[in-house]
Each structure stands twice: as structure tokens, then as C-alpha cells.
Amino acid sequence: MNHFELFGLPSQFQLDGSLLSSKFRELQKRFHPDNFATASERDRLMSVQKAAQINDAYQVLKHPISRAEYILAEQGMEIRGEQQTMQDPMFLMEQMELREELEDIADCSDPESALFDFDSKVSKMYKQHLASVEQELNDGLWAEAADRVRKLKFIAKLKNEIELVEDKLLG
């Protein structure tokens, strides 16, 4: 049973987050180990395993990048945790330039405003790539979707770096 089947959801990238959350709570309640406290050792062990499976599946499906990686893995394209280098030199150059721009924000006359503008630009880029991943997955373009997910991971990492700079600026 795959993660989508576990939650009774269609195997697709786009999903209703609130429906996922409610199904998660429902399954969590049903298979909570406390419900099996008086059951046999075997049933207690199975409930613990099922609860762990439910938690793992929820964490994967809840986040767009891990959900896309999971869908790709289901299609035989395992990219989770891979160390493959990015093959798109233009994208890598753009990422280097964006990181340099982020580093320079602290020296701006109005760093908070500059950071807000930069964050907006990167968020827009993230959303565009996310929409492309969804389309490529829907169209069964697995290799293209895998490349796009790799790029999306770079952009997500940049978004995390923006948050760190924001924490420094706002103290």
C-alpha cells in the first residue's frame, strides 16, 4: 500500500492539505498504540508499526518537494538523498548570483526592504517551479519533473537562507 492509498487519496501531486490532515488525525486516532494497550504483543507491535507508517507517510505527503520525490520514486526514479550534480549551468549561475545578491543585502541602505523584495522574487520563482513540477508529473514527464525537483530543492534552500538573514537583520 503506497502513501496515497494509506490516506485514501488519489496518487497525484496536487492534494487537499486539509483533507490530508483530517485523514491523518483519523488514522492516528484509530491506530494509536494506546488503543492496543490490552491487546496481544503482536497486535501492539503492529499498531506501533502502523502508527510509524502513518506518521512517515504524512510527513512525505505534507511537503510538496518530498511528495514529488515520492511520486517519482513510485515511477522508478529515486532522487531522494541523491548526490547528483546539477547539469544546468544557466540555473547554477543564476543560483550563484542570487546567493551573492542575498549576501549584499546586509550592506544596503534599507536592508529590510531589499530582503522583502528579494524574498518576493525567490518566492515567485519557487511557485513557478512548483507549478511546472505539477504539470510535468501530471503529464508523466518523469525525467523533466526530476530535474525540476532538483532545481526546486536549490530554491527551497535559498528560501531557508533568506529566513536566516531575516533573523539576523531583525535580531
Swiss-Prot record:
SMART domains: DnaJ. GO terms for cellular component: iron-sulfur cluster transfer complex. GO terms for biological process: [2Fe-2S] cluster assembly; protein complex oligomerization; protein folding. It comes from the Bacteria. InterPro entries: DnaJ_domain (IPR001623), HscB (IPR004640), HscB_C_sf (IPR036386), HscB_oligo_C (IPR009073), J_dom_sf (IPR036869). Residues 2-74 form the J domain. The keyword Ubl conjugation does not apply. One of its GO terms (molecular function) is ATPase activator activity. Keywords: Chaperone. NCBIfam families: hscB, PRK05014.1. Co-chaperone involved in the maturation of iron-sulfur cluster-containing proteins. Seems to help targeting proteins to be folded toward HscA. Interacts with HscA and stimulates its ATPase activity. Belongs to the HscB family. This is Co-chaperone protein HscB homolog. The lineage of its organism: Bacteria, Pseudomonadati, Pseudomonadota, Gammaproteobacteria, Vibrionales.
